[in-house]
Amino acid sequence: HTAEVARQAGLRLRTVYFGGGTPTSITAEQLKKLTDCVAEHFDLSEVWEYTIEAGRPDTITREKLQVIRDAGVTRISINPQTFNDDVLRFVGRKHPAQAVVDCYEMARELGFDNINMDIIAGLPTDTLDSFRHTVERLLELGPENITVHTLSVKRSADLSGEKAVDLSSLTGDVTEMVDYAQRRLMENGYEPYYLYRQRNILDNLENTGYCKPGKEGLYNVYI
């Protein structure tokens, strides 16, 4: 129906974005059905950018990445959040940091040349030194896009009970974390190109997307 409305209105599709969740949580077969459906009903010939959030490494396989690649996807996200294994465990992630690196390298092997990686400043139990390590590890990997989020606790987050979070207790180093990320990314040729805020965000800060020159995430700009 959406495709038909777009055709009748004479609209041309410029960006495709699957995310705001984890599309790779479905099977490779389901993922292929999804991308085939998009290709069947929409004219992708004038699409400038096609993004899928691969997200968590525990949902990524070579088969799924190949399906995505074959569908013409030009940009993916592989999100470490942090490279500190202890912090990952505390916030409920079931993978080690190395798994992110492995998925990133696998994506490069398959030919992906536009990769975004998200990190979060202010995660519970994280420290300024640990966050600096995360930033430096990202710079070593060299993705085309890096998005620096500031922690915003959502209702569904597994930070209740023993992991209950007092937002006021997490604000200590978060501004320094964000400032460090900005300085180091810009020193290494990344440019800030979009930002947005969320509810319950620490220190009233924002989320900022950085990119290498000419690698802006177009969907992020348009919204």
Question: What are these model-predicted stretches?
Answer:
Residues 1-181:
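Conserved non-cysteine loop/helix-boundary elements of the Radical SAM core domain that shape
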Residues 156-223:
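A C-terminal junction/extension of Radical SAM enzymes
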